[in-house]
Design a protein with these regions (language model features):
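Short, glycine-rich nucleotide/cofactor-binding loops
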Residues: 63-72
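Hydrophobic positions on the alpha1 helix immediately C-terminal to the Walker A/P-loop
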Residues: 75-76
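Nucleotide-activated chemistry modules centered on ATP-dependent adenylation/adenylyltransferase
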Residues: 1-63, 79-254
Length: 254
């Protein structure tokens, strides 16, 4: 087994690569941040926001954010609502597990603090129970059903609400090492990053689970996805989880 000589990331991380000096791609990407013109990137972000600003008329939502209620979600919503003066709608996926008091507070807080509507998907509990057991026993991935919805639900909702500008936090493959080594603003291919890949429907149905129960796990059609313009916030601003936490804390995050 190989480990990155800088951060000790092992080669068991899917898609991770090492250069001739034994340093992982994530560390090299971080080092290259100093060469990025972040002022120019922010101007790109302003132009990107202006492209969609007010697109659905007065009072209409002009962008969307996939949120969990965590520190990064707070940062993303703060950036779009308070800094860029957009009007975001938020999409969230529950997991049907008991939530901590902090978790309950944080998801409520992100709506109350920034004055945003959250549309939350509470997955089909019967299907989740069946699929958790099946995917644990067969693939070692008990949470696949919920993980998949986290990727697909915001896309479906962005299409329904006509909010092509769908915000995600960081490009996990680029920031931490993974399937894609390309730095891009576009999150269009995020659904293919290997975290929650799709499975053939015949693998999923059975034991009381039908295709009707699984419609949201399917990605939107190619035609619908072509109308969307999802993006990574980490492309436009230097991504820093601790600074995100500090901003979130200032706005009521527990």
């Amino acid at each position: 087994m190989r480990y990155c000589k800088k951060c000790t990331m092992p080669d068991t991380r899917p898609g991770i690569t090492f250069d001739s000096e034994g340093v992982c791609s994530a560390c090299r990407h971080y080092e290259n941040r100093k060469n990025v013109d972040w002022d120019a990137r922010f101007k790109e972000f302003e132009a990107y926001c202006n492209k969609y600003r007010g697109m659905n008329g007065p009072g209409g939502y002009d962008c969307a954010v996939a949120v969990s209620g965590g520190k990064d979600s707070h940062f993303q919503v703060w950036m779009l609502k308070e800094v860029m003066h957009m009007n975001p709608i938020l999409f969230s996926v529950e997991d049907n597990f008991p939530m901590t008091q902090a978790g309950i507070h944080n998801l409520k807080n992100i709506s109350e603090e920034f004055g945003c509507t959250i549309i939350s998907c509470k997955p089909n509990i019967r299907a989740q129970k069946v699929l958790m057991r099946k995917f644990f026993e067969k693939y070692g991935k008990p949470t696949w059903y919920v993980d998949r919805l986290i990727y697909t639900f915001p896309l479906h909702m962005a299409a329904k609400f006509n909010t092509p500008m769908l915000c995600y936090g960081e490009n996990v493959s680029f920031e931490y090492g993974g399937c894609s080594d390309k730095e891009t603003y576009s999150a269009m291919d995020q659904i293919e990053n290997g975290v929650a890949v799709g499975f053939p429907m015949e693998e999923l149905v059975g034991d009381g689970v039908t295709e009707n129960d699984l419609s949201l796990t399917l990605a939107p059609s190619a035609e619908e996805r072509a109308k969307l313009d999802p993006f990574y916030m980490s492309y436009f601003v230097p991504w820093n989880s601790y600074k995100n936490y500090q901003i979130a804390k200032e706005h009521g995050f527990h």
